[in-house]
A protein has these predicted regions:
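Canonical P-loop GTPase G-domain recognition
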Residues: 132-188
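Conserved small/polar residues in nucleotide/adenosyl-binding loops
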Residues: 254-260
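Conserved G1/Walker A P-loop phosphate-binding module
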Residues: 5-72
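Conserved nucleotide-binding/hydrolysis micro-motifs of P-loop NTPases
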Residues: 44-46, 68-71, 102-105, 130-133, ...
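Switch II of P-loop NTPase G domains
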Residues: 45-50, 69-91, 102-114
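Flexible loop/N-cap segments at domain edges
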Residues: 234-236, 240-252
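C-terminal end of P-loop GTPase domains and the immediately downstream helical coupling element
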Residues: 165-227, 237
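Conserved C-terminal guanine-recognition region of P-loop GTPase G domains, centered on the G4
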Residues: 87-152
Length: 260
């Protein structure tokens, strides 16, 4: 039958997006999916959950695992975070290592490469934020240093901000897909429920409001979601739970300013 033929031709891959905090992993995931699923903020450690994004086109399905940003393991907590990323990598078919243009390769980058090198999985290297690149020699140094550590399938300079290079990156990822049935239906974007996605977006906005505050004490609870009758609008009521009173003041001030 036609369904059987389609199944026989299907290809898929589970891909872990890994890298240090704030190199743009969530932004790249959102660009690859064509929608906003992962929380994007300029604060370290803002990807709270292991949000999985699913991209399906024709016979190919790519399943992305957006791991928490890698912290250089200066202490036991940092070491735990590195191990958390490594455990995610162990479950995937390929890795996408994201580094930032204009910055030198750190020990944390090297450590991560060594950890998934032992697993023997194919890996791509994406150098993000090339729109901010001022010195091409820094880019060439990054490529040379990381390529000496690992035989990447491809090195792709990209800008998640303006989309430059993202089509080329997607094509390289598609090339990593192996024959095998799809794990998710065609219209699936994430394994996270709708309320979790909405809560993450609200939390992102709250983090942007707290420019000088540490973001670890904020949680968002969705109290109510209801489609507005006859309109393509969703009414949402949410509670933002703050660990510190100073957070409340910042958020209320920002809300009042937005209303004006």
């Amino acid at each position: 039958t036609m369904d059987t033929e389609n199944y026989m031709n299907e290809k898929s891959a589970f891909i872990a997006i890994v890298g240090r905090p704030n190199v743009g992993k969530s932004s790249i995931l959102n660009r690859l999916l064509g929608t906003k699923l992962a929380i994007v903020s300029n604060k370290p450690q803002t990807t709270r959950t292991r949000i999985m994004g699913v991209w399906t086109e024709g016979e190919t399905q790519l399943v992305f695992i957006d791991t928490p940003g890698l912290i250089k393991p200066k202490n036991s907590l940092g070491d735990y975070m590195v191990k958390s990323v490594t455990s995610s990598v162990a479950d995937v078919d390929a890795c996408l290592l994201v580094v930032e243009a204009n910055t030198k390769i750190s020990k944390a980058d090297e450590e991560l490469v060594h950890r998934f090198k032992d697993l023997g999985v194919p890996a791509l290297l994406a150098i993000n934020k090339i729109d901010l690149l001022q010195d091409k020699s820094v880019l060439m140094e990054q490529i040379a240093k990381l390529s000496a550590l690992y035989d990447f399938e491809a090195v792709v300079p990209v800008s998640a901000q303006d989309g430059n290079g993202m089509d080329a990156l997607r094509e390289e990822l598609i090339a990593l897909a192996e024959p095998g049935g799809h794990f998710f239906s065609e219209d699936t974007l994430t394994d996270q429920p709708e309320r979790a996605i909405v809560a993450e977006i609200i939390r992102e906005k709250a983090l942007h409001a707290l420019d000088d505050e540490i973001p670890h004490g904020i949680a968002v609870c969705i109290d109510r979601m209801k489609q507005r009758k006859g309109q393509n609008i969703m009414d949402i009521e949410a509670t933002i739970v703050c660990e510190r009173d100073s957070h409340k003041g910042c958020l209320l001030y920002t809300s009042d300013a937005a209303d004006e």
